[in-house]
């Protein structure tokens, strides 16, 4: 599906931009030009994870796709679990390899953490996708049997409980106590609703002008809101940058719909590039932190140029390096099947 390939390619580029820009956002002061430039890249790319959820929904909830409970539990979930624990263990061992200093006690403790589901931070996406896959038979049955009005109501209900209320709660603006304090959904459960939105937007996409408008609105919320909150606090205040908060979700919806409009019109060479990027996106997501951690170990930072230039430059090096590694790994059948 061309739309999904292009969207996944855009999403993985943005994942790397987020991770490269996170360092300056955490270490530098909000009242500096460098921080504001870093926030630009951190905001403009913030839709990456919800865009991946939208892509998953567009593919996995498609009525024409046969997806049985047996396939989910004998192929999809074992694939995710194998990849998750392999890469989590690899991230534990990697720092010792970089420094060529093998501390058995430290490695043992790290591997125990892996068994206890304490993994490299960015692997949280796989934790969520395990639940998304487990719920697929229910999500598919629920969506495919509802009439259009009830589906629209369900999406609105999810948007309020899974997007708006959690954002208000994180900002300290949801003052309800008792049971109402439990109304906001966690990001993990909200991701299921996001996949449903992806399915709905593939069937009935936003118009081009509307897509552009919601992208700009989402960016304004991320950049303007985060800048204002951070300047007030004196350090990064990231509530409006969270994956399924309103800003990133608005941008993701707009970008997903624009990809549907643009993808069929791309020249063949770019279509092939988008297809390659889409296929490699999962592997790049899993492995790109190796390159970024190597940057940190060897002292490669964004300080060689203004962040407006250095962040995309480092992201490009990381992407190309990781893509090359994933391409080589994909030639090994067992790795291609289970680990990327």
Model regions: which residues?
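Solvent-exposed interhelical
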Residues: 133-160, 199-217
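C-terminal "closing" transmembrane helix and its immediate cytosolic amphipathic cap
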Residues: 263-275, 289-340
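Alpha-helical transmembrane segments and terminal signal-anchor/GPI-anchor hydrophobic tails
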Residues: 207-271, 275
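Interfacial loop-to-helix transition and helix-capping segments at the boundaries
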Residues: 39-49, 114-128, 167-193, 226-254
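Transmembrane alpha-helical segments and their boundary/interface "anchor" motifs
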Residues: 35, 42-51, 63-97, 104-121, ...
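Aromatic-anchored segments of alpha-helical transmembrane domains
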Residues: 16-20, 88-89, 157-170, 216-230, ...
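Functionally critical transmembrane alpha-helices in membrane proteins and complexes, commonly lining
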Residues: 2-62, 81-88
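Structural signal for the C-terminal ends of transmembrane alpha-helices
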Residues: 58-67, 137-146, 197-206, 257-267, ...
């Amino acid at each position: 599906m061309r739309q999904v390939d292009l969207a996944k390619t855009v999403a993985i580029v943005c994942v790397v931009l987020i991770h490269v820009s996170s360092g300056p956002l955490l270490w530098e002061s909000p009242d500096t030009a460098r921080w504001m430039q870093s926030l630009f890249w951190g905001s403009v790319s913030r839709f990456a994870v919800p865009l991946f959820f939208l892509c998953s929904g567009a593919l996995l909830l498609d009525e024409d796709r046969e997806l049985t409970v047996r396939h989910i539990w004998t192929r999809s979930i074992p694939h995710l679990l194998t990849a998750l624990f392999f890469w989590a263990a690899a991230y534990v061992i990697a720092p010792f390899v970089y420094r060529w200093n093998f501390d058995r006690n430290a490695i043992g403790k790290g591997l125990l953490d892996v068994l206890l589901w304490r993994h490299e931070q960015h692997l949280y996406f796989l934790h969520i996708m395990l639940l998304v896959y487990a719920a697929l038979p229910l999500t598919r049955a629920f969506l495919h049997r509802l009439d259009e009005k009830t589906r629209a109501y369900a999406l609105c209900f999810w948007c309020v409980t899974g997007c708006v209320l959690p954002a208000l709660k994180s900002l300290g603006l949801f003052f309800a106590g008792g049971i109402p304090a439990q109304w906001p959904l966690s990001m993990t459960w909200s991701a299921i609703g996001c996949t449903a939105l992806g399915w709905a937007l593939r069937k009935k996409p936003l118009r081009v002008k509307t897509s552009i408008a919601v992208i700009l609105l989402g960016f304004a919320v991320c950049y303007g809101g985060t800048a204002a909150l951070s300047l007030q606090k004196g350090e990064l205040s990231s509530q409006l940058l969270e994956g399924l908060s309103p800003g990133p979700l608005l941008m993701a919806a707009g970008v997903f719909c624009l990809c549907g409009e643009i993808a069929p019109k791309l020249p063949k060479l770019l279509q092939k590039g988008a297809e390659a990027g889409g296929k490699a996106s999962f592997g790049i997501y899993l492995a790109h932190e190796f390159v970024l951690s190597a940057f940190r170990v060897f002292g490669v930072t964004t300080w060689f140029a203004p962040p407006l230039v250095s962040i995309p430059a480092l992201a490009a090096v990381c992407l190309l390096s990781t893509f090359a590694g994933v391409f080589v790994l994909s030639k090994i059948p067992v790795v291609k099947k289970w680990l990327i």
